[in-house]
Amino acid sequence: MASTGWARRGFGAAVLTACAVLLAGCGGDGQNASASQGPGGGCPSAWLGGELGAGSSVELLVAAGPTIPGGRWPAYRAMADAVAGCAGAGTSVTLRPITDRSLTELPLFSAAVPEQTGQNAVNPLRYHTDLRGFVVREAAAVDRLPEVGKTATASDPLGALSAAGQSLRLGATGSKHVVIAIFNGWQQTRALNLFSYQRDPAGQTAAAVRSLRAGGALPDLGGTDVVIVGLTADVASMQTSDAHLAGLCRFWRGVVEASGGTLKLCAAALPGIGDRG
């Protein structure tokens, strides 16, 4: 897999704002790319802010270590950090790394966006300090991702989706469930290796779903909105083209729907956040 080629940055670095390039076959609705303000600070994606309403439960799954495509880390980091800035008050955010052991990887971060209630309602300084702390802690956890799973030899986003589904079932009832997965679109494990379907991943969706279901490896995403971004074209080492990415989007739509979820977006980037680092 490609190396990360990433560089550390200060917390105040500007988020890229070029429009997202949506891939054929998996368009999303409400692609308003104008900036908005979430409780956690500046929200660079109005679309994302609309998805992460107050009191939601959010599982953020992000490629880690060698599963990050070369040159893509700045964009991946910007999208991951945007979740903290766009999430509504009271929204819980859990960050999980995507590695070759995604199902058993412990979360790197789990906390709720502070609400303006109790002492925070009468002390604005305390409230904004708490908000700032939430955003800073989430960003620090995101910055650890390139060093997580450095020896990984495969990528298991399905395992991360399964872990997210399990966590959401055990969480607060009545809240909106959202999974945001940021990775290159490929699954490479013994249970499912999409590289074997490289020419036409979408054409193998039904067979893959049957195999995953029979093996108990199909995630439980009932009632969950799923966002998949970070898909990367023009990767010479993986011979990935835009047509391949469109096929990957159709594949993941089939898997998510078979798991009981709804694929809201499948694209190179979140609307409002640059698709290139």
What are these regions (language model features)?
Residues A236-G277:
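A cross-kingdom marker for long, charged
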Residues L22-G25:
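C-terminal motif of bacterial Sec signal peptides marking the signal peptidase cleavage site
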Residues M1-V15:
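Bacterial N-terminal signal peptides that target proteins for export
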Residues G27-G30:
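Bacterial signal peptide processing site
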Residues W186-H244:
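VWA/integrin I-like adhesion module and closely mimicked acidic/polar interface patches used
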Residues T99-V142, N193, A243:
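Short beta-strand-loop
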